[in-house]
């Protein structure tokens, strides 16, 4: 029997850099409350959100991803010619086809490289990061861009008091490649499809096209169900990720959970028994929930402010629509 040849690549893979793009428009809680019976204090107390960013009409998930990738490449001291592939993780690339990744690669000037989109709700960044690391270790690529990008603002029903204050827009990218020491641990991922309706688009686009004068599609959220699932299940996911990476909770310097709700993340910190001085990302306060972009955006913010530094040992946990989750231990990159 003829054997099929295989390839292998770098054994030690890590994050070389991160780059963030935040839209200019800042939307306050007071502006959100013009459409609902609520207040800045009520929203902040329950979510930890004070402001968020909304993209301009001429901005898209792909255009924001491109800018984030440019900044990540610059921070790594690389050019588009040094990249072998792009993975875009998003829930808001509003074209069924073509995928966003080849468009982003072309905009960067990276011709002929591999590119694909990955959709796993708010856990998408963890899935994409794991895929990139495995591709590099398998020899399919040497250096890759992974970018989380979302334009969620058009999907929000601004009169839905249950979630109109949560979601926001933005993008952040990391460069993944060979490092002197292991910089990305195994990905622990899974899903609970029995709770798929907990975060959902309520009307599909085909149904809407058949009745364009009817209700339009929006994202709907069953907040209490998601809160319970995340607060009480994701602690175990984090422990499994640490076990897989061979590290203890007291060795974690930085905790970067999905920026869905600061109250959920406060419970996770207690559940995980991290060190009292461990840095906990709280980018949600001025960024909102940017779904697949939230973890890399939060990483960028920690590095920009100096709250974390390159090389710090970080636990990442993404969770959301699906319901899906993905977690891994990484070394923080350059900002």
From Swiss-Prot:
Annotated dodecanoyl-CoA binding sites: 38, 122, 289, 319, 321
Miscellaneous comment in the UniProt entry for this protein: Was identified as a high-confidence drug target.
Activity regulation statement: Phosphorylation on Thr-45 decreases activity. Sensitive to thiolactomycin and resistant to cerulenin in vitro. Inhibited by decylSSCoA, which modify both of the active site cysteines through disulfide linkage to the decylthio-group.
GO molecular function, one term: fatty-acyl-CoA binding
Entry remark concerning the domains of this protein: The last Arg residue of the ACP-binding site is essential for the weak association between ACP/AcpP and FabH.
Effect on the protein upon substituting residue 46 to A: Retains 7% of wild-type activity. Loss of activity
Pathway connected to this protein: Lipid metabolism; fatty acid biosynthesis; Lipid metabolism; mycolic acid biosynthesis
Location(s), subcellular: Cytoplasm
Entries under NCBIfam families matching the protein: fabH, PRK09352.1
Subunit structure: Homodimer. Both subunits can react with substrates or inhibitors.
This protein's UniProt keywords: Acetylation, Acyltransferase, Cytoplasm, Fatty acid biosynthesis, Fatty acid metabolism, Lipid biosynthesis, Lipid metabolism, Multifunctional enzyme, Phosphoprotein, Transferase
Keyword Ribonucleoprotein on entry: no
PTM: Phosphorylated on Thr-45 in vivo. In vitro, can be phosphorylated by multiple Ser/Thr protein kinases (STPKs), particularly by PknF and PknA, and to a lesser extent by PknD, PknE and PknH. Phosphorylation decreases enzymatic activity. Phosphorylation may fine tune the interactions of mtFabH with the components of the FAS-II system.
Bilayer-spanning residue ranges: none
Catalysed reaction, written as an equation: malonyl-[ACP] + dodecanoyl-CoA + H(+) = 3-oxotetradecanoyl-[ACP] + CO2 + CoA; hexanoyl-CoA + malonyl-[ACP] + H(+) = 3-oxooctanoyl-[ACP] + CO2 + CoA; octanoyl-CoA + malonyl-[ACP] + H(+) = 3-oxodecanoyl-[ACP] + CO2 + CoA; decanoyl-CoA + malonyl-[ACP] + H(+) = 3-oxododecanoyl-[ACP] + CO2 + CoA
Keyword Translocase: no
Protein name: Mycobacterial beta-ketoacyl-[acyl-carrier-protein] synthase III
ACP-binding, as annotated region: 259-263
Impact after mutating residue 161 to A: Retains 69% of wild-type activity. Loss of activity
Family the entry assigns: Belongs to the thiolase-like superfamily. FabH family.
Protein origin, superkingdom: Bacteria
Subcellular location, principal: cytoplasm
């Amino acid at each position: 029997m003829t054997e099929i040849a295989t390839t292998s690549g770098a054994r030690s893979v890590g994050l070389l850099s991160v780059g963030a793009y935040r839209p200019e428009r800042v939307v306050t809680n007071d502006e959100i409350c013009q459409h609902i019976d609520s207040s800045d204090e009520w929203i902040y107390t329950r979510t930890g959100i004070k402001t968020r960013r909304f993209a301009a009409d001429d901005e898209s998930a792909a255009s924001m991803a491109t800018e984030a990738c440019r900044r990540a490449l610059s921070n790594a001291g690389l050019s588009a010619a040094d990249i072998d592939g792009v993975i875009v993780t998003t829930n808001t690339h509003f074209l069924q086809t073509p995928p966003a990744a080849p468009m982003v690669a072309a905009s960067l000037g990276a011709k002929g490289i591999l590119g694909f989109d990955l959709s796993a709700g708010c856990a998408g960044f963890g899935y994409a990061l794991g895929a990139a690391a495995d591709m590099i270790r398998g020899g399919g690529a040497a250096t890759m861009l992974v970018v989380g990008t979302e334009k969620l603002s058009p999907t929000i029903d601004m009169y839905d008091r249950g979630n109109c204050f949560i979601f926001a827009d933005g993008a952040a990218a990391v460069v993944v490649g060979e490092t002197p020491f292991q910089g990305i641990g195994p990905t622990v991922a899974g899903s609970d499809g029995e709770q798929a309706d907990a975060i959902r688009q309520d009307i599909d686009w085909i149904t809407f096209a058949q009745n364009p004068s009817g209700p339009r599609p929006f994202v709907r959220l069953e907040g209490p169900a998601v809160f319970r699932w995340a607060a009480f299940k994701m602690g175990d996911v984090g422990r499994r990720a640490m076990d897989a990476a061979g590290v203890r909770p007291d060795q974690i310097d930085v905790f970067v959970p999905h920026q869905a709700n600061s109250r959920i993340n406060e419970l996770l910190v207690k559940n995980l028994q991290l060190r009292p001085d461990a840095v906990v990302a709280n980018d949600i306060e001025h960024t909102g929930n940017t779904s697949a972009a939230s973890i890399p955006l939060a990483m960028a913010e920690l590095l920009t402010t100096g709250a974390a530094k390159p090389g710090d040992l970080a636990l990442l946990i993404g969770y959301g629509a699906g319901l899906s989750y993905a977690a891994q231990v990484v070394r923080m990159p350059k900002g």
